[in-house]
């Protein structure tokens, strides 16, 4: 059960970082 929690936290952290970079780079690409 702990492995599932750690895996979820790892994927969630990577997802947040990727989303933050994509959201920050998005306006420049649209322009």
Swiss-Prot record:
Q: Which SUPFAM superfamilies does the record match to this protein?
A: Photosystem II reaction center protein T, PsbT
Does Lyase appear among the keywords?
no
BP GO terms, sorted? photosynthesis
Q: Which InterPro entries does this entry report, sorted A to Z?
A: PSII_PsbT, PSII_PsbT_sf
Q: Does the keyword Lyase apply?
A: no
Q: Transmembrane region positions? A: 3-23
Q: Name one Pfam family in it.
A: PsbT
Cellular component annotations (GO), alphabetically ordered: chloroplast thylakoid membrane; photosystem II reaction center
List UniProt keywords, sorted A-Z: Chloroplast, Membrane, Photosynthesis, Photosystem II, Plastid, Thylakoid, Transmembrane, Transmembrane helix
Q: Which domain of life is it from?
A: Eukaryota
Membrane topology of this protein: Single-pass membrane protein
Compartments where located: Plastid, Chloroplast thylakoid membrane
Q: Which PANTHER family match?
A: PHOTOSYSTEM II REACTION CENTER PROTEIN T, PTHR36411
**What is the similarity comment for this entry?**
Belongs to the PsbT family.
Q: How does it assemble?
A: PSII is composed of 1 copy each of membrane proteins PsbA, PsbB, PsbC, PsbD, PsbE, PsbF, PsbH, PsbI, PsbJ, PsbK, PsbL, PsbM, PsbT, PsbY, PsbZ, Psb30/Ycf12, at least 3 peripheral proteins of the oxygen-evolving complex and a large number of cofactors. It forms dimeric complexes.
Briefly, what is this protein's role? Found at the monomer-monomer interface of the photosystem II (PS II) dimer, plays a role in assembly and dimerization of PSII. PSII is a light-driven water plastoquinone oxidoreductase, using light energy to abstract electrons from H(2)O, generating a proton gradient subsequently used for ATP formation.
Tell me what this protein is called: Photosystem II reaction center protein T
Q: Which organism is it from?
A: Euglena gracilis
């Amino acid at each position: 059960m702990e492995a599932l929690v750690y895996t979820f936290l790892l994927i969630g952290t990577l997802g947040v970082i990727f989303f933050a970079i994509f959201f920050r780079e998005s306006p420049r690409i649209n322009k």
